[in-house]
Amino acid sequence: MTDTPSASDAEAPLRQAAPLWGAALIKDEVTRLPDAPGVYRMIGEADEVLYVGKAKSLKKRVVQYAQGRFHTNRIANMVDATRAMEFITTRTEADALLLEINLIKQLKPRFNVLLRDDKSFPEIVIRRDHDAPQLRKHRGAHTIKGDYFGPFASAWAVNRTLNTLQKAFLLRSCSDSVYDSRDRPCMLYQIKRCAAPCTGLIGKDDYQALVDQAEAFLRGKSRAVMATMAKAMEEAAEELEFERAARLRDRIRALSAVAQETQINPETVEEADVVALHVEGGQACVQVFFFRAGQNWGNRAYFPRITGAADDPEDETVTEEQRIITAFLGQFYDDKPIPRLILANVQPAESELLSEAFALKSGRKVEIAVPKRGEKADLVQHVLTNAREALGRKMAEGSAQTKLLAGVAEAFKLDAPPERIEVYDNSHIQGANAVGGMIVAGPEGFMKGQYRKFNIKSTELTPGDDYGMMKEVLRRRFARLVKEEEEGDDANRPDLVLVDGGQGQLDAAIEIMADLGVDDIAVVGVAKGPDRDAGLERFFIPGQTPFMLEPKSPVLYYLQRLRDEAHRFAIGAHRTRRSMDLKKNPLDEIEGVGPGRKKALLHAFGSAKGVGRASVEDLVKVDGVSQALAERIFGFFRKG
């Protein structure tokens, strides 16, 4: 006799265990974790990464989240929001730290301390892939073969040093193509900024001696270099070579000027970054001063995101300042040269581990120290004062910014102060090299890391069709936004869009945004006054009569700043595109003329114009140029 299944038995296959959340989920995960170093990620309901952490023992660290003994409510909130966890084991704890740093920068978790506006720094490179090494500014990955020196805190700092090096060591700064095409010295030789190796006015060995002196100076041997030059000047004077002595005198003066301009030149610090943290009112500022070759190469202030960051459940003795400085240093040096010495006002948590990780990255010992007395302590105190002042300025600006955004909301009848404002402008010359620019602003001011430029691609636009250009820019921008939102990516949706122009530009913007289904975003046209007078701007809002703001209104000044910044950015992008277009060499358009033949032709005739004037008979004399290619080149310059 066959048993008849009960109702409860029939329902059993349909019944599923409730998904685990929060502490229960973490407790379940712990049972499968190894007692090994690694990185863990806490995942939220929308598959967003809430937190990234590292551990010497994944099992021992993660179990603490399930035990309920939380240092602050922030950890409790993070645990409650966790619906999944992911783990990566590593060979050592130092490897885990490096991976944690990389993932935090990549994923930007809500509960981690996060370094914002982390831009690369300019450096100086002495190229080593040419008989006459070139001195130049560089930013980004070290793709050029040569010796790199930096970082410099700003373009101004690196340009000042380059200017000094040119005066003192007379090294070339021109590109290889310009160098190879010279048959007489350029203006830099005339003003004593280059020794003209391109034309043989200085021998190879003598030029290399200048390169060696420049390298020694950049490596911190400035006193030895200046002493050598002073001795050479005295010898020249004794031998009555007064012109050579005067040149050496000018070079020494140029080097001396650097020490005076950098203001802070410590005697006991050759190579170090000095880092100071100040925390106040739920905000933080980290000032970094760069010292290389015994000189101050500039400084920069950072304002890491610390609101919402979770504390370390493993060690309640770790202070907030220690957590912030540890996270900052890790993220800051993730993609930057690490100095041999880092001086700080706060001892990082796990300082020895951080030093070990930095040593792995840099291939040499890295010391992190908190000096208590002497010149180094004075340096740290000076940097801390700068951090405190910078945070004070930012907090004052933030308070004023909040009022301005509230005023913008009132002026344009928005439901709330805008968190993200996007401003658009175009720049071109009669339609040529047209570029659209987008700048972004919000409660923290201009968000320059989110600026975007749009090279106008349409070939159907009438030259100078500003409406058509604006449509293309907005279509590309908001089509991308729609795609990001559909795919669940971290999309940046603006609360307010400002377009430079009146009713026509506003209508163009509304048309595109309606087509893309983003017409819930507020759009305003900003038209300049008669004769482009500031203060007479008119504002265009859909369904409303154009209006003006009070001439001395702070909100009007703010909107003018936004418009001017968009204009500046668009013009800069246009000039860059136009400059690149002008630099295009017509030889690049000729089939069969590659880099080698191009170089040979320029060397033989000095310039593309010289090539264009050459006869077929002259062209075939150049190495690698056949009769057929010579005729093709000759015909190219004479077509039309």
Curated annotation (Swiss-Prot):
One of its GO terms (cellular component) is excinuclease repair complex. GO terms for molecular function: DNA binding; excinuclease ABC activity. Keywords: Cytoplasm, DNA damage, DNA excision, DNA repair, Excision nuclease, SOS response. Residues 223-258 form the UVR domain. GO terms for biological process: nucleotide-excision repair; SOS response. InterPro entries: GIY-YIG_endonuc, GIY-YIG_endonuc_sf, GIY-YIG_UvrC_Cho, Hlx-hairpin-Hlx_DNA-bd_motif, RuvA_2-like, UVR_dom, UVR_dom_sf, UvrABC_protein_C. It is found in: Cytoplasm. It holds the Pfam family UvrC_RNaseH_dom. Residues 35-113 form the GIY-YIG domain. Gene3D superfamilies: 5' to 3' exonuclease, C-terminal subdomain, GIY-YIG endonuclease, UVR domain, UvrC, RNAse H endonuclease domain. SUPFAM superfamilies: C-terminal UvrC-binding domain of UvrB (SSF46600), GIY-YIG endonuclease (SSF82771), RuvA domain 2-like (SSF47781). It comes from the Bacteria. The UvrABC repair system catalyzes the recognition and processing of DNA lesions. UvrC both incises the 5' and 3' sides of the lesion. The N-terminal half is responsible for the 3' incision and the C-terminal half is responsible for the 5' incision. Interacts with UvrB in an incision complex. Belongs to the UvrC family. NCBIfam families: PRK00558.1-5 (NF001824), uvrC (TIGR00194). This is UvrABC system protein C.
